[in-house]
């Protein structure tokens, strides 16, 4: 069994000491059986909110750091069954890709393009209470842009 724990802090003392942080943890993940589908067996890597998609995006995020730094962790996590996970991973990595060429079914999106894509796939709730979005943004400019948007 394994568990994924994700924190919102950057790995710098200023973030740990001076900012509010959040932690998300997965359910316990069993080793993947030989019959359990892996991310490569699902067209497009799965739907947001599924374990298949979460695993694909998490492994892509870790791979973005380079195989030398995170390859061992990627290999270990690839052995586990993520089907119990019901979450969408939203991470940020440096990228110079053009927005109009991005396709989340073919590759993991990062940062603001990922926010846009994930929110497009979240179905609206069918009741009268307003919905809430909780976000942590460490840039004053991005926080102002995001928090003042009515969309």
Each language-model region and where it sits:
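Conserved short internal alpha-helix adjacent to the catalytic or cofactor-binding core
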Residues: 4-6
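Charged, low-complexity intrinsically disordered terminal segments
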Residues: 12-151
């Amino acid at each position: 069994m394994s568990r994924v724990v994700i924190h919102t802090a950057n790995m710098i003392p200023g973030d740990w000491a001076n900012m509010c942080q959040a932690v998300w943890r997965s359910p316990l993940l069993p080793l993947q059986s030989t019959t359990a589908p892996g991310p490569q067996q699902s067209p497009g890597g799965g739907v947001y909110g599924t374990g298949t998609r979460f695993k694909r995006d998490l492994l892509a995020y870790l791979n973005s750091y380079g195989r030398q730094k995170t390859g061992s962790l990627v290999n270990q996590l690839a052995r586990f069954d993520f089907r119990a996970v019901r979450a969408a991973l939203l991470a940020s990595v440096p990228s110079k890709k053009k927005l109009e060429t991005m396709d989340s079914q073919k590759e993991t999106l990062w940062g603001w393009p990922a926010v846009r894509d994930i929110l497009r796939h979240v179905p609206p709730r069918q009741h009268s209470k307003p919905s809430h979005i909780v976000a942590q943004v460490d840039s004053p400019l991005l926080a102002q842009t995001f928090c003042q948007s009515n969309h």
